[in-house]
């Protein structure tokens, strides 16, 4: 950021401002014309002798204003104001209502209407005639107007996205920067008004989105294009003259002439960037920069009176218009004078005293307390019987999660991200906080979705403040009843998990008291909106609980809920379980088999795609040569190949969905293994999320887990084997000769 700043002379804020223009309507000095999105046109006179904020006139139109231009567009009439709107091009004349020229009015002369919305325009100067206006529509078609006549209309360009346009009178060339390409067109080609697409003389790939274009006249005309990340200059033949790389995003650009140096060899330009900086260049040489204290989207260099010539006029996105000039005094600090004498002995004593205070403060625990930042609390709110959200399962209940924030002073907005397998109206929420409030809260409903069945009831909330760059994250488990409802038990389910306890089993109808079951030894649950069921059984003789289901993904969430309820009902009881490694191996085998089939389908898709393209090429060649006899055979072959291609793509998508479901089941088994290991007081890194949110293969993740989650015993053995050439104690190692004798 520059140390120098722009000194403000005149400023005013007009809401919904879209464009600004400097034009001379009287007294051989310039006035400022401001156009708005609401159709308002304001003509102000900053160089007025009494007040700088003097407004000549304000006119309301019915259309949003895109661009304005001022010139002698009509014969025998000077300084006509041309206003471009999405549907009209309107000409206005300025009439003064008072003899002292302090008040004026805008009178509409005539207008041209468009059938397609306009995008921008440029002025085409004509020797010994009135200037013309070239308008580009939103679909990249050009229309030329001269006064009240339309020369031609809707001439198409070879582009889809409109961009800046400019005209060079010296070479009579039109420049367009559409689709990220700068192209040159001879203006004489468009004089016929043909509806055929026009060929370019030359084109250049800018590699970025063009924002603004300026064209300079003279013996060496130059086209200067401002893009988001660079400024490029081109000569008449399309060669790059120079280029400037911007450190921030470019916002606006304007050219100007120096009042003291009359040298047309160089181009002088001002570029504004998104980091509130104005860059003043002489061609590609940076001669000055300053802090604009705003990010201008429009720039002008105007002379409003003889006292303030070549002042800079800027327009901000919020409608603030500032007229100022470059300051030469740094606004951050001033360098000390060279005559200041520093007493180094006193400075050293001062540093020693400060160091002693810091040591005493550290010994006492520190005098500076760490700022806690934003505090977040999660709690379960109302549980409703049925939600009306469109993405919810049929007859699914909802649960409101209350998110409470505290210590949010000076925080205006919080970005909340939601991570949960349960559905909600939105995964991203923006919470607006009042500036005078220190607390805020929001309720977010959760329910079972209609597209994806959840395998976990865990909800993670992350709140981020863009201003302070602070982020807080909390997690909570949704109630079990939000996901499941009571159903019939299934004793013949394929997948089982056993939970052992040191004490007698507890009645299941008491553990799950919110359900209406009266059976103390068996209870069944089904996921809302689906036929997925899970059953829980209690065995009094063996003091065990058994969980059975046809869906692996339901074992983990049910076992976790069961263990939590047992621990709450009987504190201190020992609980354990057997990790189902055979289910993991079975799921891994199925994933590998599906991935093999997916690779075969991918090869088949590539083969059929090449075959379809070859048939299309043969068909086009036959049409060009006129050999139409083999078209029925090619049509039949194309139909067969295309159907096989569609079948292979359907199979590929189906296998991809199956692989994702199997991966979700495997992640659930990993979390189940982590939960059962934790019951035995063994923490492991292999949980349900260590592979879920990565793009790595399972083999790579397991390698990382083995290196990361190793016990001290394995580390000791590894170090001993790598660095100890001695024999291990208490282990008899026989020599090779003795082994050979025993073998003989």
UniProtKB/Swiss-Prot annotation:
Question: From start to end residue, where is composition biased (Acidic residues)?
Answer: 734-744
SUPFAM superfamilies assigned: WD40 repeat-like
Q: What happens when the gene is disrupted?
A: Mutants have normal body morphology, but with reduced body length and width, delayed larval development and decreased roaming movements. Defective cilia structure and function characterized by an increased accumulation and mislocalization of intraflagellar transport proteins and impaired movement of intraflagellar transport proteins along the ciliary axoneme. Disrupted assembly of the BBSome complex at the base of the cilia. Defective avoidance of nitric oxide and P.aeruginosa.
**Which GO cellular component terms, listed alphabetically, does the Swiss-Prot or TrEMBL entry include?**
BBSome; ciliary basal body; cilium; membrane
Q: Which UniProt keywords apply?
A: Cilium biogenesis/degradation, Protein transport, Transport
Q: Which PANTHER family match?
A: PARATHYROID HORMONE-RESPONSIVE B1 GENE (PTHR20991), PROTEIN PTHB1 (PTHR20991:SF0)
State what this protein does. Component of the BBSome complex. The BBSome complex is thought to function as a coat complex required for sorting of specific membrane proteins to the primary cilia. The BBSome complex is required for ciliogenesis but is dispensable for centriolar satellite function. Required for proper BBSome complex assembly and its ciliary localization. Required for cilia biogenesis and both the assembly and movement of intraflagellar transport proteins along the ciliary axoneme.
Q: What is this protein called?
A: Protein pthb1 homolog
Q: Which species expresses this protein natively?
A: Caenorhabditis elegans
């Amino acid at each position: 950021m520059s140390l120098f700043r722009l000194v403000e002379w005149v400023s005013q804020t007009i809401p919904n401002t879209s464009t600004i223009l400097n034009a001379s309507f009287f007294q051989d000095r310039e006035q400022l014309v401001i156009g708005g999105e609401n159709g308002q046109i304001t003509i102000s006179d900053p160089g007025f002798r009494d007040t700088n904020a003097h407004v000549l006139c304000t006119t309301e139109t019915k259309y949003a204003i895109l661009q304005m231009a001022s010139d002698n567009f009509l014969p025998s009439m000077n300084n006509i104001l041309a206003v471009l709107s999405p549907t009209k091009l309107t000409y206005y004349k300025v009439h003064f209502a008072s003899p002292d020229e302090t008040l004026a009015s805008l009178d509409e002369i005539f207008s041209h209407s468009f059938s397609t919305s306009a995008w921008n325009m440029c002025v085409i100067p004509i020797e010994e005639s009135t200037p013309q206006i070239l308008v580009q529509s939103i679909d990249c078609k050009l229309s030329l107007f001269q006064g009240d006549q339309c020369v031609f209309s809707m001439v198409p360009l070879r582009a889809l996205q409109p961009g800046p346009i400019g005209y060079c009178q010296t070479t009579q060339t039109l420049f367009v920067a559409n689709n990220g390409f700068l192209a040159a067109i001879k203006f004489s080609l468009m004089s016929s008004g043909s509806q055929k697409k026009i060929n370019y003389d030359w084109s250049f790939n800018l590699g970025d989105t063009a924002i603004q274009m300026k064209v300079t006249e003279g013996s060496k005309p130059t086209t200067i294009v401002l893009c988001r990340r660079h400024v490029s200059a081109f000569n008449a033949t399309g060669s790059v003259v120079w280029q400037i790389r911007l450190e921030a995003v470019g916002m606006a650009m304007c050219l100007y002439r120096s009042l003291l140096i009359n040298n047309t060899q160089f181009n002088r330009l001002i570029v504004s960037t998104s980091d509130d900086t104005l860059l003043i260049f002489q061609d590609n040489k940076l001669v000055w920069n300053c802090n604009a204290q705003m990010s201008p989207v429009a720039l002008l260099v105007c002379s409003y009176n003889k006292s303030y010539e070549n002042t800079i006029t800027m327009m901000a996105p919020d409608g603030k218009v500032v007229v100022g000039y470059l300051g030469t005094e740094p606004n951050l600090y001033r360098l000390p004078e060279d005559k200041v004498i520093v007493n180094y002995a006193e400075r050293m004593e001062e540093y020693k005293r400060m160091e002693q205070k810091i040591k005493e403060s550290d010994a006492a625990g520190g005098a500076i307390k760490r700022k806690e930042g934003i505090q977040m609390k999660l709690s379960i709110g109302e549980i409703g019987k049925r939600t009306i959200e469109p993405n919810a399962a049929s007859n699914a209940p909802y649960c409101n999660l209350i998110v409470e924030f505290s210590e949010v002073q000076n925080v205006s907005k919080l970005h909340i991200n939601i991570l949960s397998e349960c559905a909600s109206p939105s995964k991203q929420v923006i919470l607006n906080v009042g500036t005078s409030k220190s607390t805020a809260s929001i309720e977010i409903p959760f329910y079972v979705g209609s597209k994806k069945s959840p395998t976990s009831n865990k909800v993670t909330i992350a709140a981020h403040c863009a201003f302070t760059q602070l982020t807080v994250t909390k997690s909570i488990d949704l109630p079990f009843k939000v996901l499941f409802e009571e159903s019939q038990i299934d004793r013949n389910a394929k997948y089982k998990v056993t939970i052992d306890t040191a004490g007698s089993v507890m009645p299941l109808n008491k553990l799950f008291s919110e359900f209406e079951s009266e059976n103390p030894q068996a209870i069944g649950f089904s996921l809302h909106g689906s036929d997925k069921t899970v059953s829980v059984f209690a065995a009094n003789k063996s003091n065990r609980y058994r969980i059975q289901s046809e869906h692996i993904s339901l074992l983990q969430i049910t076992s976790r809920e069961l263990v939590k309820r047992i621990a709450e009902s009987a504190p201190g009881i020992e609980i354990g379980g057997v990790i189902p490694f055979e289910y993991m191996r079975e799921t891994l085998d199925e994933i590998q088999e599906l991935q093999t089939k997916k690779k075969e389908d991918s090869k088949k898709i590539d083969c059929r795609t090449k075959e379809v393209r070859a048939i299309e090429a043969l068909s086009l060649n036959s049409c060009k040569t006129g050999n139409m006899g083999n078209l029925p055979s090619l049509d039949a072959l194309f139909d067969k190949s295309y159907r096989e291609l569609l079948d292979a793509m359907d199979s590929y998508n189906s296998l991809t969905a199956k692989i994702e479901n199997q991966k979700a089941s495997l992640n659930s088994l990993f979390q189940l293994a982590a939960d059962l290991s934790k019951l035995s007081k063994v923490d492991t890194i292999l949980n349900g999320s260590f592979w879920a949110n990565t793009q790595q293969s399972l083999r790579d993740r397991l390698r990382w887990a083995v290196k990361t989650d190793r016990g001290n015993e394995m580390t000791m053995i590894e170090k001993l084997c790598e660095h100890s050439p001695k024999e291990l104690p208490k282990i008899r190692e026989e020599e090779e000769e003795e082994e050979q004798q025993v073998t003989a």
